[in-house]
Amino acid sequence: MNHPIEKPVLIDKEVVSELRFPEPDVLFNPAARTKRQTEIDRAVYLGNTEHTKVRILFHDNAGLKQIETTIWGATDKRIILKSGMVIPIHRIQEVKI
C-alpha cells in the first residue's frame, strides 16, 4: 500500500456527492493501478449481472473512506454507483468483491 495504515470511515453512498477529491492518484505503482482497474471491471460485471455489492476503499480530501454498494458502470475516469453517485478512479485504493 502507498498509505500508512489508516482505518477507513464507513459512509453511506448518498454522501459521496458532498465529498471533495484531490487530483493526485492514490496509487503510485503501475501494477497496483492495473489491479485496481481489473477489480473495477469485475465489480461492474457482477453489479450488472448479479447485483453484487462490493466494498470500495477510497480517499477524499479528509482521508480514507469506505462504502458498500453496487457499481453499475465505469468510464475511463469515474465509477458510477447504484445511486448515480460517482467516485474518481484515481482516488480509489481498492475494490473488494
Question: Where are these predicted regions, by residue range?
Answer:
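Short glycine-rich, low-complexity segments
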Residues: 1-63, 95-97
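Short, Lys/Arg-rich amphipathic alpha-helical interaction segments
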Residues: 72-97
